[in-house]
Amino acid sequence: MKVRPSVKKICEKCKVIKRHGKVMVICENPKHKQRQG
């Protein structure tokens, strides 16, 4: 899980979603998981 000020899709399979008011990227590739912090 990377925590960064701006989250972006890295590949085609990345999805930008909102959970508990936080913007997150979920993906099949665990390295692509990101959370806005």
From Swiss-Prot:
Residue stretches spanning the membrane: none
Write down a Pfam family by its short name: Ribosomal_L36
Tell whether Transport is among the UniProt keywords: no
* A single cellular component GO annotation: ribonucleoprotein complex
Top-rank taxon, per record: Bacteria
Q: Which GO terms describe its biological process?
A: translation
Could you tell me the keywords of this UniProt record?
Ribonucleoprotein, Ribosomal protein
Q: Any keyword Ribonucleoprotein?
A: yes
Query: Do you know which HAMAP family this protein is assigned to?
Result: Ribosomal_bL36
Checking PANTHER family in the record gives:
50S RIBOSOMAL PROTEIN L36, CHLOROPLASTIC, LARGE RIBOSOMAL SUBUNIT PROTEIN BL36C
The similarity annotation says: Belongs to the bacterial ribosomal protein bL36 family.
Under what name is this protein listed?
A: Large ribosomal subunit protein bL36
